[in-house]
């Protein structure tokens, strides 16, 4: 799964990268410890216009009576996303991009403190995850929510965790956003093994309250 990430890109850079119109209420950057249930940056496309907009990280199905009315759905498995009642309509009709600098994952060994790793693209470019989104309404409450699509881990990721966010390249963005017709299922594949860089980082990030650039600074193994 992907349960923590960081975003250091300025809003202007994101706007230019996606050729998107930015909302006025985007989350502040940089944020070196982005956690579930907070607003994150997303990109959607409608009628030929891309929009950079905030969404709550944590997909809320329409039948939830309240935001915490069931399991916290921060990820959606690519293998079952088109079949699960919570996700299937969003998979067909409401797909988004989720820009990040990288994400954290923990290698867990029984009896030991979880070991945090910082994962980025090996070429230094920003990461862009595939996402799905949903408007949730109950009475006067309204939230726009999202989840990150995941795949099986590639061989490089597998020693740390068995899942990996679905990482999209720029040529895949139009297809995922529905701008280039159908066939998005064809790009739901694990990233190539050489596409990712893995670095050990401080256990400070084990706390969801930790902040600061030191969280992504590599340490000796």
Show the residue positions of the predicted features:
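Short linear sequence motif anchored by a di-proline
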Residues: 1-221
């Amino acid at each position: 799964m992907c349960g923590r990430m960081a975003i250091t890109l300025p809003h202007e850079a994101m706007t230019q990268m996606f050729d998107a119109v930015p909302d006025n209420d985007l989350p502040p950057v940089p944020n070196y410890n982005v956690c579930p249930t907070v607003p994150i940056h997303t990109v959607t496309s409608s009628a030929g216009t891309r929009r950079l907009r905030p969404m709550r990280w944590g997909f809320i199905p329409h039948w939830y009576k309240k935001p915490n009315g069931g399991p916290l759905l921060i990820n959606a498995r690519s293998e079952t996303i088109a079949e699960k009642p919570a996700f299937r309509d969003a998979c067909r009709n409401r797909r988004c991009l989720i820009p990040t600098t990288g994400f954290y994952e923990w290698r867990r060994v029984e009896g030991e403190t979880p070991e945090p790793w910082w994962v980025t693209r090996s070429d230094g470019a920003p990461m862009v995850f595939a996402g799905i989104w949903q408007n949730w309404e109950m009475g006067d409450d309204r939230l726009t929510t999202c989840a990150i699509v995941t795949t099986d881990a590639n061989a490089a990721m597998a020693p740390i965790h068995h899942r990996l966010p679905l990482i999209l390249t720029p040529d895949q963005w139009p297809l995922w956003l529905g701008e280039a017709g159908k066939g998005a299922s064809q790009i739901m594949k694990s990233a190539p093994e050489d596409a990712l860089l893995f670095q050990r980082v401080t256990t400070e990030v084990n706390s969801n309250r930790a902040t600061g650039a030191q969280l992504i600074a590599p340490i000796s193994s």
